Regions:
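Secondary-structure edge/capping motif, primarily at the C-terminal ends of alpha-helices
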Residues: 30, 59-63, 117, 121
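Helix-loop "lid/cap" segments that line or gate small-molecule binding pockets
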Residues: 43-50, 59-62, 137-143
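Hydrophobic alpha-helical connector segments
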Residues: 14, 18-21, 25-54, 107-110
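C-terminal peripheral helix-coil segments that are non-catalytic and often amphipathic
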Residues: 86, 90, 94, 123-160
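Hydrophobic alpha-helical bundle segments that form small-molecule/ligand-binding pockets
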Residues: 78-113, 117, 121-123, 146
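Short secondary-structure transition hinges
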Residues: 49-96
Length: 160
């Protein structure tokens, strides 16, 4: 490995970048005509659950120790904010999300919750699916219209 990568930080960086690229491609492949934001949210959460079940939590804990990765994650968070704005606007247009959402505040709150979960190793104290279910109820269901709630509840019943 160290013939290709000079140090562990470079290796981890490449793994994270490649994994992010793979996830992005999978989501883009999934998003076909006829699907909506609720379908996509649940698909992404399924992928995250599968990944979390495959990866040792120590891996996630290790990532925050490297400056190059911290910079990458900060840049990724900015890009994800832009994608979130577009995604919520799409959900509003589709009639699944409320139109009176302060997207910047919403984005900050969801990011802070994710950071809290990781920084406090909540996944070691609670079942990951319970964390996910609570996250969905707090941050997805709360911005749904009645139409969105009905579909989300159905999707959640199938998932949980």
């Amino acid at each position: 490995l160290y013939e290709v990568y000079q140090n562990k930080e470079d290796l981890l960086y490449e793994v994270v970048v490649m994994n992010d690229k793979r996830k992005k491609e999978e989501i883009e492949k999934f998003d076909k005509p006829g699907l909506n934001v609720i379908n996509i949210v649940m698909h992404v959460l399924r992928l995250q659950t599968e990944e979390f079940n495959r990866v040792n939590p120590l891996f996630y804990e290790e990532l925050g120790r490297y400056p190059k990765l911290r910079i990458y994650f900060a840049d990724r968070e900015n890009k994800e904010h832009e994608q979130l704005v577009d995604f919520i606007e799409r959900g509003v247009d589709e009639g699944y999300f409320l139109s009176n959402i302060d997207i910047n505040l919403y984005s900050s709150l969801t990011a802070a919750s994710g950071d809290y979960i990781m920084a406090n190793f909540l996944y070691n104290k609670c079942n990951y699916k319970e964390i996910l279910k609570t996250f969905i109820l707090l941050y997805i269901r709360s911005i749904c219209t009645e139409k969105g709630i009905k579909l989300l509840d159905k999707e959640m019943a199938d998932f949980f």
